[in-house]
Structures are given as structure tokens and as C-alpha cells.
Amino acid sequence: IASFLLRMWTFPLLCAVALRATTHFKEEFLDESSLDRWTQSEAKEYGAFELRKGTKHGDTVIGKGIATSQDAHFYAYSSQVPTPFTNSNEKLVVGFTVKHEQDIDCGGGYIKLLPELDGKKFDGDSEYWIMFGPDICGSTRKIHLIFHYNGKNLLWNKEPRCADDTLTHSYKLVVSPNNTYEVYLDNEKVESGNLEDDWDFLPPKQIEDPDDVKPTDWVDEEIIDDPASVKPADWDDEPEKIPDPKATQPAHWDEEEDGTWEKPMISNPKFKGEWKPKRITNPAYKGKWAPRKIANPNYAPDDQLYLARKPVAAVGFDLWQVKSGTIFDNIIISDSVEEVDAFLEARLLGVAQKERDMLVEQTQSENQDAPEDKYEDEEAKEETEL
């Protein structure tokens, strides 16, 4: 009932947004027929996706999604965009949900936006425009955002942390025509900035002048020996090793047979070691020298870094997972932030809290069923054996 009322409440909002927005792609995985829109790659032996809900789902229908089902496998699964599109002078807004129900240890959870694609040949070498979503392996817990530009896949110079629990989380990307971007986790902004600043789309605006030469009188030694520091006259009077003054000749020592007895040598506590002058700040120090900066002749601005160079024609998951069980759902691509927000909110409002409540109940139940200590467990085992 609550789920029905939620949908009835959000329906007018979705209709109002839809009047002024363009939805390029939407997938909710509500039933088996949704899988007809997706293609399993045959490029090699990939792991299979299956339609299912989570064991700690918040809604019987909303909780369904496509889940990775085989451990230690690569996955390649894609769907065609009904009408390929470009984002010229429009925002690109991508949203989807990820639920690492298996408590993932190493694996990807990101989605790709691709140009024209033969889904049966889809693999890790297939060209894509954007790769976006969580990536977890070992200590790595980050949100990936990679752009393809001029034949290169550009890595983000930021690494915001992704969610790493077993609950459902939404990820949203907004790319705007002014070459800015925003990344959201559960509709909370975790990063934003300028495309040119945060990826190596373009050469640097300035470079070091190759003709600039360090002056011969430039002083870049910050610390020097104190010229006023003088070695004491008695510094070297004491040797490094001396006979042990506490040593005595053993009573059984026979000089005719054993030779002349000599005291063993020990470190001299008065030995001062190598003398070094005191170090001081160089009064003539000018700082670290660096060539002056000049305008880079190879730099050319591009006010369309945000733009897909080829129409977006497909979406896909190209992943590796050691432990399977990740559920993907609620995929949407639009030119409207409001539409994506309304779509995700309608499907996730209250779901995460329900999942948390179910997780707490499960944990409490497991704690109640567990023996108080290992000794009780061992006693029970002994009684069974008797």
C-alpha cells in the first residue's frame, strides 16, 4: 500500500517534468520482458546476469534488477538506446542504482555510454564515451568517471569515495554545456568542477620556456656550512677504540704458551667522531629556480568538451567481479536533472531505510541464534557425541 501511494503521489510530478524534458533511456527491470532489451556479449565467455530482487530489498518490485551471478567472471551486457542522441547545448544527466549485496571485495559497478554498438561483440576494448560508477577492490573505494576524447580514455584526477555497504545507492552524473560537471551519491553532491581542470582533455595553457636558462650566479643552496664554525683543537685527541680498562688477564693465561695478553678493545666514550661544521640558512639563497612560464603554442581551447563526439547509441556494463551478486537497477539518461531526481526519488524513497531495518533485524536474529561463547558450543558438541 505504501509503495502504491508513493507512486500515486509522485505521478503528477513526473508528468510535469516530462513535459519539458527528454528521456533518452530508461530501464527499471520490472519483469522478465525487460531482459529482451539487453544483449549478452559473445565476444568471450562472460558471466551471466539474472533478474532478481535482493534478499534485503525494500520493495518487492522496485527491488528487482539485473544481478551478476557468477564469481570470478568478466561481464559484458548492453542495451540499445531507442533513439541515439547527442547532448549539443543540453545537459547530460545519468542516474542508476547499485546494490553490492554480496559485500563486494573486488569488482566494478560502473555503467558505460557507448556509440553505435554490436552488443554481441561488446568487450573491454569497445569504444565508449563515458564510464561512470563505483569501483571497489582492496583499499580502493572510489567513484570512477572516465571520458573518451580524441582517441584517449581520460582518468579523473579526483577519487571521491563510493558507498561500500550492502544497501541500495543511487549515483548521478550531470554534465553541462558550460563544461562543468557534478557527481552525486544518494543525491548528495560529492564532487563538482570544470572538465578542463579535472581531466587532461587539453594540453596545459602554459609551459616552461625551453629557452629560459638558469643564471650562473643563481644561488639555490638553501642550507650551507657555517663559515664561522671552527673545529676544536682537541677534537681528534681521542681515538675511536681503546683497551677496556676493566679487563684483567685471566688467571690461567700462560704467556709462554698463549703469548702476550692484551686487553680487548672497546668503543671510546670520549671519541667525538667526524667533525662537521654547523649548518645555517644561506643568506644568499634565492629559492628553487624554475624556467619562466610561457603560453603553450599547442594549446587550443575547446568549449565543447562536454559534447559526445558520436551519438550515444547504447548503454552497457563491462565489469570484472571476484564475488558476484551486485544488483543494478533504475537506469535513466535525460537532459533534465529534475526528471532524473524525480525518477530516482520515486523508486528509492524509503527503500534504503527499509533495507537498513531488515539488516538490523537480521543481525539481531543472528546474534540471538549464536552461542554465548565457544565453551557452550563445545559442551553442546560433547553432549551430542555422548
Regions found by a protein language model. Give the residues of each.
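Short surface loop/edge beta-strand patches of beta-sandwich-type extracellular domains
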Residues: 70-89, 156-160
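Short, aromatic/His-centered strand-loop micro-motif at the edge of beta-sheets
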Residues: 147-172
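Localized edge beta-strand/strand-to-loop motifs within extracellular or lumenal beta-rich domains
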Residues: 167-186
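A carbohydrate-recognition surface predominantly in extracellular/luminal proteins
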Residues: 87-102, 331
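Glycan-recognition/cleft segments
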Residues: 51-58, 112-150, 157
